[in-house]
């Protein structure tokens, strides 16, 4: 079957490319905020719903006319910023999520997405470069090859200052061989999860080491003069430590979910209301640490890819 897979690479833009990326982040944030304000104003004045197409037309006809510098960045990036705003707006109405917030330039994670058209995005594994709209060829660490059709590229900068690009590819995926083994999963706090046949997936102990480093660095930061050179150096160390924890955890979850999906045809787990549970301050950190949401998310899409059945049951369902 054909599936969408994302391949994430670290990129090393030169000074000119970094300026263009920063400009695109800023323009996307500006367009997101302006179209959100426009949508809010129309609804308050006329009680009319505004579609994402209306917002896109408003950007092209009004905003680009008033703010010429918007034409200096990739047009697909601006359109996708509007579509992201629309998705947040739809979530507010359909899923009763919080009302979309205006984006701040102080956000730690910055990103924009551009679409593939007429070969404007290309990955060259021989030269180790990625071609992107308005950036030309950017140096990259291309550690994984892929085959398939590029659909989009998301350029991001994390709080440690590193740049990445995530290439979304439509690729053919070979399903795993059928198995007659079925399993139930009990999500835990002491351990990540325990399967119905007694297998225990422990929480990673190595993360504790980095969490201790984090506490030490945060203590150091509180003693630094704000906006001093050492303050920013320590902030960067904290960001790198967070990144290390995030990467170790995600890599481990991929290994666990792959093993569970490979060995079982039907996988059953509890349908936990994680958002509500995180509101309990005594449980919040423990739940975030064991990453239930990310594990169940991975099990869900990997089951679809491999012809497996993943079922979430009510927490209080009497399985006996």
Each model region followed by its residue ranges:
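Generic detection of short hydrophobic beta-strand segments and adjacent strand-loop junctions
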Residues: 9-11, 137-140, 200-203
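Short, surface-exposed charged micro-motifs
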Residues: 10, 120-122, 152-155, 182-184, ...
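TRNA-binding/sensing appendages of the translation machinery
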Residues: 11, 85, 299
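Hydrophobic (often cysteine-bearing) scaffold residues that line and stabilize catalytic clefts
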Residues: 17, 21, 28, 74, ...
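Short, Φ-rich (hydrophobic/aromatic) sequence segments
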Residues: 28-39, 81-89, 93, 214
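Acidic carboxylate diad motif detector
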Residues: 54-158, 289
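Positively charged, helix-rich recognition surfaces that bind polyanionic ligands
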Residues: 144-146, 159-320
């Amino acid at each position: 079957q054909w599936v969408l897979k994302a391949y994430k690479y670290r990129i090393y833009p030169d000074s000119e490319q970094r300026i263009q990326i920063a400009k695109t982040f800023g323009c996307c944030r500006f367009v997101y905020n302006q179209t959100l304000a426009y949508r809010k104003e129309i609804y308050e004045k006329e009680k009319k719903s505004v579609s994402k197409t209306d917002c896109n037309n408003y950007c092209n006809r009004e905003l680009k006319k008033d703010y010429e510098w918007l034409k200096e960045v990739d047009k697909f990036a601006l359109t996708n910023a509007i579509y992201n705003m629309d998705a947040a707006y739809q979530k507010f109405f359909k899923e009763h999520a919080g009302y979309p917030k205006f984006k701040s330039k102080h956000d730690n994670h910055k990103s924009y997405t551009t679409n593939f058209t007429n070969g404007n995005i290309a990955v060259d594994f021989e030269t180790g470069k990625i071609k992107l709209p308005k950036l030309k060829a950017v140096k990259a660490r291309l550690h994984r090859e892929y085959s398939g059709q590029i659909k989009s590229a998301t350029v991001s900068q994390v709080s440690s200052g590193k740049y990445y690009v995530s290439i979304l590819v439509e690729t053919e995926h070979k399903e795993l061989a059928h198995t007659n083994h079925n399993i139930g999963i009990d999500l835990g706090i002491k351990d990540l999860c325990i399967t119905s046949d007694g297998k225990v997936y422990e929480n990673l102990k190595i993360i504790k080491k980095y969490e201790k480093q984090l506490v030490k660095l945060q203590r150091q930061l509180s003693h630094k003069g704000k906006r001093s050179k050492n303050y920013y150096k320590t902030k960067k160390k904290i960001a790198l430590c967070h990144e290390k924890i995030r990467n170790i955890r995600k890599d481990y979850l991929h290994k666990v979910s792959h093993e569970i999906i490979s060995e079982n045809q039907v996988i059953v787990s509890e349908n936990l209301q994680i958002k509500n549970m995180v509101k309990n301050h005594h449980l919040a950190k423990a739940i975030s640490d064991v990453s239930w949401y990310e594990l169940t998310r991975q099990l869900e899409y990997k089951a679809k890819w491999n012809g497996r059945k993943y079922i979430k049951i009510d927490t209080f369902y009497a399985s006996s």
